[in-house]
Amino acid sequence: MSKEKFERTKPHVNVGTIGHVDHGKTTLTAAITTVLAKTYGGAARAFDQIDNAPEEKARGITINTSHVEYDTPTRHYAHVDCPGHADYVKNMITGAAQMDGAILVVAATDGPMPQTREHILLGRQVGVPYIIVFLNKCDMVDDEELLELVEMEVRELLSQYDFPGDDTPIVRGSALKALEGDAEWEAKIIELAGFLDSYIPEPERAIDKPFLLPIEDVFSISGRGTVVTGRVERGIIKVGEEVEIVGIKETQKSTCTGVEMFRKLLDEGRAGENVGVLLRGIKREEIERGQVLAKPGTIKPHTKFESEVYILSKDEGGRHTPFFKGYRPQFYFRTTDVTGTIELPEGVEMVMPGDNIKMVVTLIHPIAMDDGLRFAIREGGRTVGAGVVAKVLG
C-alpha cells in the first residue's frame, strides 16, 4: 500500500458543491469521484451513498452533510455535498465545512434559480474565495445560443456579488452521462478537475498564518509571572517574541518568556497545540478569558459588524418564538460571551426560528475579529443561532 503514504504529501484542498435544488449537485459529486477514480485511482462513491448524508453537529446545530474525497495528479480534495437547501445555509454559516473553493452547479435547462442566487450571496458573505461553474444537463439542450445565454446570466449573477464573473471558469457538462460512463461527458469532468487544480490556489496552512491564540484561562505562578492557556489557532509563538493582548480592554503589549505543554518547557507553540504562554510584566487581573494573544498589528478589536446568521428552529432546540429589533442576546466568540444589540435589514420586522438573515451587531465590549470569524448566538448559555462576521464596520 505505498500509494496511501504518497497521498499525504499532496496539498489538501477543501471544496464543495453549491446550487439550486435538483440541478444535479449530488449527481456531479458522484460523477467526480467515479471519473477521477477511473482516471487517476481512488475510490468511487455511488449517488445513493452520497445522498443519504449522515447528521453531524456543529455549534449545537444539526446538519446533514456528505463528505467524499478524490485525487487529481497534483492534489487531494475533500468535498462536501448537502442534501437540502437548509443544510447548505447552516453549513456555510457555521463554517462546519470551510471551503477553499466551491463548484456552483447550474442546470442548463433552467438557468440560474432563486437558490443559485442565495448560494452565491452566502458564498460572498461567509468568505468562499473562489467559485467554478459546472453547467449541468447540457446533453438536454441542443441550442448553442441558449447555452450561451445561460452562461451569460450566470456570469452576471456572479459579478453582482463581487465574484469575477467574466473570468470564472465555466464547464459545460452532463453529470448523469458522465456517471453512466459516456466518454464525451467524462472528459468534461476531467476538465472540471483541471480547473479545481488551476483556478483555486493552494490554501495557506494555519501554521503559516500570523500567530493567534484565544485565551481560555489565566494563572499566576509565583516568581514566574502570568501564564495564559489555550489552543493556538494559527501561526507559531516563539520564546522571546512580542505579542499583543487584544479584545475586551485596551490592547496591551507583552513578551512571551516561556511556552509550555504538558508541563514541559518548549521553544515554541504551533497551530493546533494546547499551550501555556508565560507573559512578561502582565498582572493576572489585567488579562481575561475571551481576549486573544496575537502577533502585533495582525488583528484589531471591533464592536460593530455586519453578519449573516442562522436562527435555530424549535426542533433544533432553538427559540419557540420570533425576535424583533432591540433583541439583546449574547454573542459567543471563541471562548467568551459578549452582549450585543442587533439591527435588522430594512423592511424586516421580525426573525422566525429557522430563518437565515443579514444583521448588523453592536457589542458592548470589543472583540478581536476579522471578516470570516464564526460565532454562536446564545441566551442564558443555550445556543439559539450561529453566525459569521461578513464585514467589520467599526
UniProtKB/Swiss-Prot annotation:
Query: What keywords is this UniProt entry annotated with?
Result: Cytoplasm, Elongation factor, GTP-binding, Hydrolase, Magnesium, Metal-binding, Methylation, Nucleotide-binding, Phosphoprotein, Protein biosynthesis
Annotated region (G1) at 19-26
Question: For the region G4, what residue ranges are annotated?
Answer: 136-139
Q: Which residues form the tr-type G domain?
A: 10-204
Quote the record's binding site residues for GTP. Answer: 19-26, 81-85, 136-139
Which EC class heads this enzyme's classification? Answer: hydrolase
Give the modified residues of type Phosphothreonine.
T383
Enumerate the InterPro entries for this protein.
EF-Tu_GTP-bd, EF-Tu_GTPase, EFTu-like_2, EFTU_2, G_TR_CS, P-loop_NTPase, Small_GTP-bd, T_Tr_GTP-bd_dom
Which SUPFAM superfamilies would you find in this protein's record?
Answer: EF-Tu/eEF-1alpha/eIF2-gamma C-terminal domain (SSF50465), P-loop containing nucleoside triphosphate hydrolases (SSF52540), Translation proteins (SSF50447)
Return the annotated region ranges for G2: 60-64
Coiled coil regions in record: none
| Spans annotated as G5 | 174-176
Q: Enumerate the residue ranges of region (G3).
A: 81-84
Biological processes, Gene Ontology terms = translational elongation
EC numbers: 3.6.5.3
Which GO terms fall under molecular function for this chain's record? GTP binding; GTPase activity; guanosine tetraphosphate binding; translation elongation factor activity
Catalysed reactions, as listed in the record: GTP + H2O = GDP + phosphate + H(+)
Transmembrane segment boundaries: none
Q: Which cysteines are joined by disulfide bonds?
A: none
Primary location group = cytoplasm
Q: Where in the cell is it found?
A: Cytoplasm
Question: Which residues, renumbered to this chain, carry the PTM N6,N6-dimethyllysine?
Answer: K57
Protein family membership: Belongs to the TRAFAC class translation factor GTPase superfamily. Classic translation factor GTPase family. EF-Tu/EF-1A subfamily.
Entry function: GTP hydrolase that promotes the GTP-dependent binding of aminoacyl-tRNA to the A-site of ribosomes during protein biosynthesis.
Annotated HAMAP family: EF_Tu_B
This chain's protein is named Elongation factor Tu
**The organism's taxonomic lineage, starting at the top:** Bacteria, Pseudomonadati, Pseudomonadota, Gammaproteobacteria, Enterobacterales
